């Protein structure tokens, strides 16, 4: 209940009104004036409207130009650059400032003697140095690049901040020149893209020394054994390796492979399984296509046997008709090996590294199987689909013969890799086989 507080105004009970020019005096009985205290008003269930975010005007980032150079006019900036007044990272931002004023690299070179290549190196090097400062790197590390550090920092420009700090420390500790810094940066940047390469798992990606060691280790495998170049690269890889695992991998390569490993390498050279990468839009642009039923490797033999054996296209529209219903199909271009298969089926695997001995990318693949060719031949150049624990797997003909296996689920005809934007390679090379 609300309590009301009445207050009577103490004005006169008479008031005057003017009617047709005459004053009329009549008593007026005023109603009490009521005030309601705010404490007695019940709170509303409605929430107050959210506060709107106030408009924040654009504030440009702080100028990279040191305070002592900010008041300079154009002539003053040119004078500082021409005379190299100050440290390189202090006057480097002046070059960008002149660009915004309409100067070009050739005109700046003519006025200051700084070539276009050096201008770019100074600008980028200063930006890399700023990222090291903002990352909280040790002051002594930053100071190591105060003199002639632009070229070194320019080389690590493509690395992220964490990698830049690690690379900068490695460069300082080992006294690298520009070429050494560039090799180190490329080794760190390239390491993740070498997924599946031989020996990659023996090197630590988080250590610049191991990244550089792996690059040298990988290059050594491009040369025949024995050779002076190969030995030199492996010795350098051993010197730069940090972890014990990486050192052992390099030592194994340096001291030579065992006879068993050599035999295995020779066997790999005769593999005849074609491997292709499907390109975006290739199916749509193909003059002919092949439709195949699809099974997952983990579904096992039972699912494979259920897949339709007979299917063909006909009629004016090329409608595909199968002997039984099936839920999963794949459309492939009319490649000759696939067209030649009469009773084919496609088996999907989730990780290519666990299927065939190649330098896989950890991606899904589709394996085309010829179900008419089930007899196993003692040849390492052929692969066959066989039953395995938890599904199906691929194995060499010679290995199966040694195990006493004479019949398989079918022979491998083709391995198809999925389309990728960053991979222009359409067929796997012989040297990519592990």
Curated annotation (Swiss-Prot):
Residues 1-51 form a transit peptide. The keyword Glycoprotein does not apply. GO terms for cellular component: chloroplast; chloroplast stroma; plastid. Pfam families: Raf1_HTH, Raf1_N, RuBisCo_chap_C. Residues 273-419 are annotated as: C-terminal beta sheet. Keywords: Chaperone, Chloroplast, Plastid, Transit peptide. Has 3 domains, the N-terminal alpha-helical domain, an extended flexible linker and the C-terminal beta-sheet domain. The N-terminal alpha-helical domain stabilizes RbcL dimers and RbcL dimer-dimer interactions, facilitating RbcL(8) formation. The C-terminal beta-sheet domain probably dimerizes Raf1. The 2 C-terminal beta-sheet domains are swapped and pack against each other to form the dimer interface. InterPro entries: RAF1 (IPR037494), Raf1_C (IPR040858), Raf1_HTH (IPR040781), Raf1_N (IPR041358). GO terms for biological process: ribulose bisphosphate carboxylase complex assembly. Its main location: plastid. Required for assembly or stability of RuBisCO. Acts at a postchaperonin step to fold and/or assemble the large subunit (rbcL) into RuBisCO. RAF1 binds first to a rbcL dimer (rbcL(2)), leading to a rbcL(8)-RAF1(4) complex formation. In the next step, RBCS displaces RAF1, thus resulting in holoenzyme formation. The keyword Chaperone applies. This is Rubisco accumulation factor 1.1, chloroplastic. The lineage of its organism: Eukaryota, Viridiplantae, Streptophyta, Embryophyta, Tracheophyta. It comes from Arabidopsis thaliana (Mouse-ear cress). Belongs to the RAF family. It is found in: Plastid, Chloroplast. Homodimer. Residues 65-254 are annotated as: N-terminal alpha-helix.
């Amino acid at each position: 209940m609300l309590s009301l507080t009445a207050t009577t105004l103490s004005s006169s009970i008479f008031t005057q009104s003017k009617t047709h020019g005459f004053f009329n005096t009549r008593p007026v009985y005023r109603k009490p004036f009521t005030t309601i205290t705010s404490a007695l008003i019940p709170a509303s269930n409605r929430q107050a409207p959210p506060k709107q975010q106030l408009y924040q005007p654009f504030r440009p980032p702080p100028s990279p130009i040191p305070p002592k150079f900010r008041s300079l006019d154009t002539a003053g900036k040119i004078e500082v650059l021409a005379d190299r007044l100050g440290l390189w990272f202090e006057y480097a931002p002046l070059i960008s400032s002149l660009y915004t004023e309409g100067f070009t690299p050739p005109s700046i070179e003519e006025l200051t003697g700084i070539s276009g290549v050096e201008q770019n190196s100074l600008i980028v090097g200063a930006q890399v140095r700023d990222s090291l400062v903002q990352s909280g790197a040790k002051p002594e590390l930053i100071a190591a690049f105060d003199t002639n550090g632009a070229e070194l920092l320019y080389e690590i420009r493509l690395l992220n901040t964490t990698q830049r700090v690690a690379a900068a420390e490695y460069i300082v500790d080992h006294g690298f020149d520009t070429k050494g810094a560039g090799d180190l940066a490329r080794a760190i940047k390239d390491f993740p893209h070498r997924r599946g390469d031989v020996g990659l798992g023996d090197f630590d990606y988080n250590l610049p020394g191991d990244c550089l060691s792996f690059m040298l280790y990988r290059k050594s495998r491009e040369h025949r054994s024995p050779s002076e170049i190969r030995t030199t690269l492996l010795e350098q890889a051993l010197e730069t390796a940090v972890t014990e695992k990486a050192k052992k991998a390099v030592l194994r390569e340096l001291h030579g492979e065992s006879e068993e490993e050599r035999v295995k390498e020779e066997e790999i050279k005769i593999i005849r399984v074609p491997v292709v990468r499907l390109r975006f839009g290739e199916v749509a642009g193909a003059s002919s296509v092949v439709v195949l039923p699809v099974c997952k490797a983990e579904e096992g033999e039972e699912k494979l046997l259920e897949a339709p054996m007979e299917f063909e296209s006909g009629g004016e529209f090329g409608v595909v008709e199968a002997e039984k219903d099936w839920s999963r199909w794949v459309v492939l271009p009319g490649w000759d090996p696939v067209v030649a298969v009469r009773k084919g089926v496609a088996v999907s695997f989730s990780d290519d590294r666990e299927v065939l001995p190649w330098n896989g990318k950890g991606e899904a693949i589709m394996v085309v199987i010829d179900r008419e060719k089930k007899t196993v031949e003692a040849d390492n150049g052929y692969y066959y689909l066989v039953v395995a624990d938890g599904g199906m797997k691929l194995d060499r003909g010679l290995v199966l013969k040694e195990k006493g296996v004479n019949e398989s689920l079918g022979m491998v005809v083709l391995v198809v890799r999925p389309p990728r934007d960053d991979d222009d390679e359409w067929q796997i090379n012989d040297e990519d086989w592990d």
